[in-house]
């Protein structure tokens, strides 16, 4: 039967042969086979009590470099072998000797090959690790190392992986990360108090990629040749063990080296004193401890920041867990507003940890109260929803809330009611804006007959305010006078005149009437017309402007005849509106259906023609209506119409040319910048031109 050592030797030999192949394909294939071989047996359980019963030797060089902020009562030991001794140090810490160093090396190579993307990009500490790799090539921070591109780092990673297949190779930072994942333990990377600019990237706790239990911690130190009092060159790794564990073993080889720890114990307690007594000053410590002033203040700053960061992280994580147990994870923006000191990567790491734990609590009372959101739904839909939610409640209570929110939005759209996001968020605060718009878009696709009907109230809405007062007053006067003349009763209540839902065509007709009345009154310039009524055609403004000269001059703007629409008059006006929509040159005559009693100031020729047409119940004929328009077009208004059309065309050409030049110079403006230069251009037009440019089209030739 093949022994464990022989299998490991065979695996390493196959990996070494695959290194000779070009690229990583052959090495990855060999690592897949090696994983199957190594998975047939697991790493032995580490023996309790630390190192075995053997003569241990304290590493004097590493001991002289042992930093003051590292864990106390620990000793770096001598480890024999070749290369950087990383795997020998880990084997010695776990099993007392370096017998399993080759197996750890093989498992680490397989881990780095099969999870290459994770260690280069997918890990939370990827940026820190890659920066440490840059600085591991030198002893000081330099611009050349800082600006190494990712492709160079990937090449260094591939070269290190290939070199790791041979026992005498040197290890780097990502070997520590991969080794932590192989051992399923944390690795405390102890870095000397040298190379201070790059030290934070190396002196840290390295956690495994995935761990199903609370991991223990191994202490491994970076050791090497001291260059000056501020610099050293890394050469190997040294295992660090606890002093009490070594004394419990009774190892005789440690006794001569124990006095060497005495001079280090006093200065090392400075940071612990600062953590216990934040108000401690430097004057109380400079006589007792050999600590410089800069080191003291750096430690005091670190201790204060440490306490603040620990408290903030604890409260932030507890808040996120509490929100998850209540039925949904708090969105990122809301979380960062509450805890700005927590990074995005930490938030997503905690979120994935909560979602991947698989431990969802029972449905809290808050979720039961969520059924009040669906109290207006039909009973059949609620029954179906209960069946779906009962199946989802077992997996995640957050899914129940999302299902209820989605059903609520779909039901509102099926009733031709569009709930704004701010109102939707009040009911379902855990749903993000993007999720809301995705659901709304899908629901609108399933309801093609949906028409966005603006809800009107007696107090008025923002839509009416944007249209102007003229959009409300003429319509209200029309309705009141029409009802009063027809029935002789009091005008109806405002609630009856303003229904909650209005068809889109009716709303557009009233908007057009309001615009026409303001143009006919002569107090609405063309620029304000374009801003107030962007959905109406500019030609309609000039047609109404020319018709304004046909009104009786004896009437003021408050004495404009208000129509009393009968059934035949309404039909005639609807046909007239449709005819004007088909032909932009058609004339929008004054309101039809006005009787001779309503207009007592001497009706004009056009008013008489309208009365004749209304009496017969038929719309106006084209030739009769075209005569005043032609006459007006030949005068001053006609010239203004032509000039305005030329100016509008030139204005659009300038806007297109501006966007095209900015697109070619790769500095495309935002809509805010564009609207400041071209305020009369609609937002949809801007995005239409932008999409055309990005699709490769040309807006302006030449």
From Swiss-Prot:
CDD domains, alphabetized: OTU_VRTN
Compositional bias segments (type: Basic and acidic residues): 570-582
Region feature (Disordered): 562-625
GO process annotations (BP): regulation of transcription by RNA polymerase II
GO molecular function, one term: sequence-specific DNA binding
GO CC field: chromatin; nucleus
Main subcellular localisation: nucleus
Locations listed in the record: Nucleus
Record keywords, A-Z: Developmental protein, DNA-binding, Nucleus, Transcription, Transcription regulation
Entry keyword annotation includes Isomerase: no
Similarity section: Belongs to the vertnin family.
Function: Acts as a transcription factor that regulates development of thoracic vertebrae.
Protein name per UniProt: Vertnin
Native species: Homo sapiens (Human)
Gene from which this protein is expressed: VRTN
């Amino acid at each position: 039967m093949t022994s464990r050592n022989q299998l490991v030797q065979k695996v390493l030999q196959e990996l070494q042969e695959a290194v000779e192949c070009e690229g990583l394909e052959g090495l990855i294939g060999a690592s897949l086979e090696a994983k199957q071989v190594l998975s047939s047996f697991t790493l032995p359980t580490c023996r309790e009590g630390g190192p075995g019963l053997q003569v241990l030797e304290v590493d004097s060089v590493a001991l002289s470099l042992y930093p003051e902020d590292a864990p106390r009562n620990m000793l770096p030991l001598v480890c024999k072998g070749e290369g950087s001794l990383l795997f020998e140090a880990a084997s010695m810490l776990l099993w007392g000797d370096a017998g399993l160093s080759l197996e750890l090396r093989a498992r680490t190579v397989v881990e780095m090959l099969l999870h290459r993307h994770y260690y280069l990009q997918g890990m939370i500490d990827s940026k820190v690790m890659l920066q440490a790799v840059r600085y591991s090539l030198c002893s000081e921070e330099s611009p050349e190392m800082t600006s190494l591109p990712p492709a160079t780092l990937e090449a260094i990673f591939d070269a290190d992986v290939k070199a790791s297949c041979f026992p005498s190779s040197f290890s780097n930072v990502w070997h520590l990360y991969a080794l932590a994942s192989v051992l399923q333990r944390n690795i405390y990377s102890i870095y000397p108090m040298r190379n201070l600019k790059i030290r934070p990237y190396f002196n840290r706790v390295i956690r495994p990629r995935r761990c199903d239990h609370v991991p223990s911690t191994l202490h491994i130190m970076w050791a090497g040749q001291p260059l000056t009092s501020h610099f050293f060159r890394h050469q190997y790794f040294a295992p660090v063990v606890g002093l009490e564990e070594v004394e419990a073993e009774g190892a005789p080889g440690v006794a001569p080296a124990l006095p060497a720890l005495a001079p280090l114990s006093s200065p090392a307690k400075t940071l612990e004193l600062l953590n216990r007594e934040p108000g401690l000053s430097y004057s109380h410590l400079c006589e007792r401890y050999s600590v410089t002033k800069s080191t003291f203040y750096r430690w005091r700053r670190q201790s204060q920041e440490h306490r603040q960061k620990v408290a903030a992280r604890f409260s932030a994580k507890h808040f996120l867990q509490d929100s998850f147990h209540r039925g949904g994870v708090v969105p990122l923006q809301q979380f960062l507003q509450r805890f700005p000191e927590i990074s995005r990567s930490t938030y997503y790491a905690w979120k994935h940890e909560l979602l991947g734990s698989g431990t969802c609590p029972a449905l809290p009372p808050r979720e039961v109260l969520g059924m009040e959101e669906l109290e207006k739904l039909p009973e059949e839909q609620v029954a179906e929803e209960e069946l779906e939610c009962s199946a989802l409640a077992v997996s995640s209570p957050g899914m129940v809330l999302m299902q209820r929110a989605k059903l609520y939005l779909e039901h509102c759209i099926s009733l031709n009611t569009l709930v704004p996001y701010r109102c939707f968020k009040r009911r379902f605060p855990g749903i993000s804006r993007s999720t809301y718009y995705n659901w709304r878009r899908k629901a609108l696709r399933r309801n093609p007959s949906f028409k966005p009907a603006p809800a009107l109230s007696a107090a008025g809405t923002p839509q009416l305010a944007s249209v102007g007062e003229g959009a409300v007053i003429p319509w209200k006067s029309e309705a009141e006078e029409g009802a009063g003349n027809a029935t002789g009763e009091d005008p109806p209540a405002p609630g009856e005149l303003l229904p909650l839902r209005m068809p889109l065509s009716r709303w557009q007709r009233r908007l057009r009437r309001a615009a026409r009345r303001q143009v006919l009154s002569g107090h609405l310039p063309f620029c304000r017309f374009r801003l107030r009524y962007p959905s109406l055609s500019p030609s309609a403004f000039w047609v109404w402007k020319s018709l304004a000269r046909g009104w009786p001059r004896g009437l003021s703007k408050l004495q404009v005849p208000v129509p009393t629409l009968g059934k035949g008059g309404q039909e005639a006006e609807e046909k007239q509106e449709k005819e004007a929509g088909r032909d932009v040159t058609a004339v929008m005559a004054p309101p039809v259906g006005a009787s001779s009693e309503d207009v007592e100031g001497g009706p004009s020729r056009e008013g008489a023609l309208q009365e004749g047409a209304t009496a017969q119940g038929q719309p106006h004929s084209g030739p009769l209506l075209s005569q005043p328009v032609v006459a007006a077009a030949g005068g001053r208004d006609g010239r203004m119409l032509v000039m305005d059309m030329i100016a509008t065309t030139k204005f659009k050409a300038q806007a297109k040319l501006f966007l095209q030049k900015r697109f070619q110079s790769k500095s495309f403006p935002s809509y805010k910048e564009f609207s400041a230069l071209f305020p009369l251009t609609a937002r949809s037009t801007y995005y239409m031109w932008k999409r055309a440019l990005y699709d490769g089209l040309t807006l302006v030739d030449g």
